[in-house]
Swiss-Prot record:
The lineage of its organism: Bacteria, Pseudomonadati, Pseudomonadota, Alphaproteobacteria, Hyphomicrobiales. It comes from Rhodopseudomonas palustris (strain BisB5). One of its GO terms (molecular function) is ATP binding. HAMAP family: Ser_tRNA_synth_type1. L-serine binds at T237, A238, E239, E291, S393. Its main location: cytoplasm. Its EC number is 6.1.1.11. Catalyzes the attachment of serine to tRNA(Ser). Is also able to aminoacylate tRNA(Sec) with serine, to form the misacylated tRNA L-seryl-tRNA(Sec), which will be further converted into selenocysteinyl-tRNA(Sec). InterPro entries: aa-tRNA-synt_IIb, aa-tRNA-synth_II, aa-tRNA-synth_II/BPL/LPL, Ser-tRNA-ligase_type_1, Ser-tRNA-synth_1_N, SerRS_1_N_sf, SerRS_core, tRNA-bd_arm. It catalyses: tRNA(Ser) + L-serine + ATP = L-seryl-tRNA(Ser) + AMP + diphosphate + H(+); tRNA(Sec) + L-serine + ATP = L-seryl-tRNA(Sec) + AMP + diphosphate + H(+). It is found in: Cytoplasm. Keywords: Aminoacyl-tRNA synthetase, ATP-binding, Cytoplasm, Ligase, Nucleotide-binding, Protein biosynthesis. Coiled coil: none annotated. This is Serine--tRNA ligase. Pathway: Aminoacyl-tRNA biosynthesis; selenocysteinyl-tRNA(Sec) biosynthesis; L-seryl-tRNA(Sec) from L-serine and tRNA(Sec): step 1/1.
Amino acid sequence: MHDIKAIRDNPTAFDAAYTRRGLSPIADSLIKLDETRRIAILASEQAQARRNAASKEIGEAKKAKDNARAEVLMAEVAELKTTMPALEAAVKDADEALKTALSEIPNLPLADVPEGADEHGNVERHHFGAKRSYTFTPKAHDDLGEALGMMDFEAAAKLSGARFVVLKNGLARLERAIGQFFLDVHTGEHGYTEVNPPLLVKDDAMFGTAQLPKFRDDQFAAGAIGSGGEGYWLIPTAEVSLTNLVRESILDEKELPMRLTALTPCFRAEAGAAGRDTRGMIRQHQFTKVELVSITTPEKSKDEHERMLSCAEEVLRRLGLHYRVMTLCTGDMGFASQKTYDIEVWMPGQGEGGAYREISSCSVCGDFQARRMDARSRGPDGKPRFVHTLNGSGTAVGRALIAVIENYQQEDGSIAVPDVLLPYMGGLKVIAAA
């Protein structure tokens, strides 16, 4: 959410940043909505003030035995009492119109974000390792998993339809091992506090992190709990639960940065992904992810962004996976983001000759989410101000599983277990068909 006062004070600067996303200028229309709201507030306040004044004058007129004057004033108060609900409704409508407009406007990119229309405008920042070489043609993870008898899409389709999978035996254990490994590194070495949050959240939580209202069709609505209860949503990412832990609160800046992590299932309708990545586990309605969230001050958010990226990279380095880090351009970055780094891991079984696929996005959101959540902090001067929020995948466990399967595949179709995962595998070093 943006600050309408800042937009009014400098509409040119707002539009200059906003149009870098490839969008048309919008400041004037927002200012007009705000002007309508201000006029409505003024009319309501003037009516209330006049009603209060007239009520006082009635008493004075009666005291002076000026009955004619008192009757005129009582008629005026009665009329104001009749018209004021409409004035108050106009204020409510104008408030809602401005809030709705502001809630559907994306965050502004930072000045150092590269300009571009889509993913082709993203810029490689650096990479780690090199593509593995094979003496055989690498297979896709779904071909390998099905041949092992440990990845069953047909069974999942009977249960839930398309874009689900049933993992069994060694691959089920491998996925669990990856998630546990990620959590252990982030909590034991990177200073994140592990949280086990609810998977069902209310409208306010989804609004706070900006999934609602704009991306309603991409979410899974769980319906109401109990008769007449409020609706719930399945979380698309633990970012929603973790970030909203500070909603409607004022934090002590001595406690910041606050770093939180969670390993959860995530649920996405993928309404805009029809026909894309229909094979395998790349794009699922349900998947597991380790999320990283940081709450910090404006002065520290840039450094915290770099730190979060390094934490996400570290677990992939230890898995021995080749990846590249991309700075997303203005046309490809997320709705709530000021700046995003994507980590793209190399998957040799994807497409013809392999492909890079996103495994993590690390974003700094500034005070965009904090304004929606009313999340603030209080510094040495005692004045509350909005915090800055950051989120990142640390990383997507399902896609990490794909990367391990495809990169560690052997010619006979078995999967070698990376060394760092051996402590979690109960002595299993190679995943092979029974």
